[in-house]
């Protein structure tokens, strides 16, 4: 009932404003926009300052209640804008900030529960202002109930005014994300899987919401950003504890997906996409380097260990917006170098891998009409077959007369083939080289 009244109060003034005969001038609109931005920034900075400054002497329970009071104050500001001023923009901002601050409240309750459950075994951050120990179970229970109630009411009101069409989806996603955030788990081998699962769950919801044009407006983007806050809080909280291999890999995967794939949905800025592309590329390479450092001893590292880097660059070349040819060129050079060292050191399966990789590079060169992968692929294929030249020599020395007869027959047949199809061979050779010249 309370949530429905809030929702009606927030939606009703919009119709009244649309029916009003007066029009807001452009200058006034700009001034009010700047003022709203300024006020929002001041509120956020004030809350961050309270959490980061020298407030270690404040008991954890009091710190939670101060944060709760700030959340309620923001909701009160939203009600004032809706009921008293009959204005919805300010109400959206206030309730949006209130819903965002609730994730901070959830994280504080989660810290209390974790400290109580784990006791002296709790892995506390080095910063005293992030430690929430020595809180009574009764108070933790009260905080949990209050937080859960406000999470539903404030989120309901916030998403109703920001994106009423997708209210159920946003509310359901927010509840699940915050429920995972409150779990009293800090194990370095479990938390990365929780982060990965939550990320893909939110990403799936985000892709669904992005398909709706109304969710690309400022209100829709704000609602989508709010539901992802628990994920970023969980990642930031995990970075305050001892790092682990799994966490590094999960964060790197998230960076790759976001920078290479997802960011294109939000902006077309050349500068932002360019920087994000290199961040994503370096993150993808870092994943493989982390795997090598974790599972492979430096003494057992071979040149073949770096072949996946060439594969990563080639795969990313199909997704990046800039320097795709450069990615494929570098990948080709790495592949050529690795095949050369593998063949010269006579590693097992080196010729087979060289031929297989060469065929793939040749096909890629034909597909993208690029000389570097095409020529590099031909070299790899030729090098792979030449590796077996030793067996041909051994065969010749063991039975020279058989090899000589076979070679003589092949030479005569080749001469006859060239003589009968001389013009076709010359014409096709010209077409081949002219086509190759036109490639990049």
Protein language model features and the residues they cover:
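Alpha-helical multi-pass membrane segments and their bilayer interfacial helix-loop junctions
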Residues: 1-440
């Amino acid at each position: 009932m309370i949530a429905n009244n809030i929702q009606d109060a927030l939606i009703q003034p919009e119709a009244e404003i649309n029916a009003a005969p007066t029009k807001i001038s452009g200058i006034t609109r700009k001034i009010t926009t700047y003022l709203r931005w300024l006020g929002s920034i001041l509120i956020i900075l004030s809350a961050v300052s309270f959490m980061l400054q020298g407030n270690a002497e404040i008991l954890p329970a009091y710190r939670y209640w101060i944060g709760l009071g700030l959340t309620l104050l923001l909701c009160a500001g939203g009600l004032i804008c809706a009921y008293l001023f009959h204005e919805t923009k300010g109400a959206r901002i206030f309730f949006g900030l209130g819903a965002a601050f609730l994730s901070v409240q959830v994280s504080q309750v989660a810290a209390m529960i974790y400290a109580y459950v784990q006791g002296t075994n709790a892995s506390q951050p080095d910063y005293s202002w992030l430690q929430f120990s020595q809180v009574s179970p009764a108070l933790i229970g009260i905080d949990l109930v209050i937080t859960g109630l406000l999470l539903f009411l404030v989120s309901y009101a916030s998403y109703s005014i920001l994106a009423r069409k997708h209210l159920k989806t946003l509310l359901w996603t927010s509840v699940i994300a915050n429920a995972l955030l409150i779990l009293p788990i800090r194990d370095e081998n479990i938390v990365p899987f929780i982060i990965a699962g939550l990320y893909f769950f939110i990403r799936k919801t985000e892709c669904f919401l992005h398909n709706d044009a109304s969710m690309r407006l400022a209100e829709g983007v704000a609602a989508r950003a709010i539901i992802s806050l628990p994920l970023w809080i969980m990642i930031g909280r995990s970075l305050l504890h001892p790092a682990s291999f799994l966490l590094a890999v999960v964060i790197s995967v998230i960076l790759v997906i976001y920078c290479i794939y997802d960011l294109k949905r939000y902006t077309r800025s050349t500068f932002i996409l360019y920087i994000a592309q290199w961040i994503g590329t370096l993150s993808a390479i870092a994943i493989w380097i982390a795997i090598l450092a974790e599972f492979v001893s430096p003494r057992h590292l071979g040149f073949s260990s770096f072949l996946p880097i060439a594969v990563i660059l080639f795969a990313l070349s199909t997704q990046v917006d800039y320097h795709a040819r450069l990615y494929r060129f570098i990948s080709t050079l790495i592949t050529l170098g690795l095949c050369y060292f593998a063949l010269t050191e006579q590693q097992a399966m080196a010729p087979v891998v060289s031929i297989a990789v060469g065929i793939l590079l040749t096909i890629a060169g034909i597909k993208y009409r690029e000389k570097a992968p095409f020529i590099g692929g031909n070299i790899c294929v030729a090098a792979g077959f030449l590796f077996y030249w030793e067996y041909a020599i051994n065969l010749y020395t063991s039975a020279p007369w058989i090899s000589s007869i076979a070679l003589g027959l092949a030479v005569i047949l080749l001469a006859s083939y060239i003589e009968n199809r001389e013009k076709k061979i010359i014409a096709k050779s010209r077409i081949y080289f002219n086509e190759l010249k036109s490639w990049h």
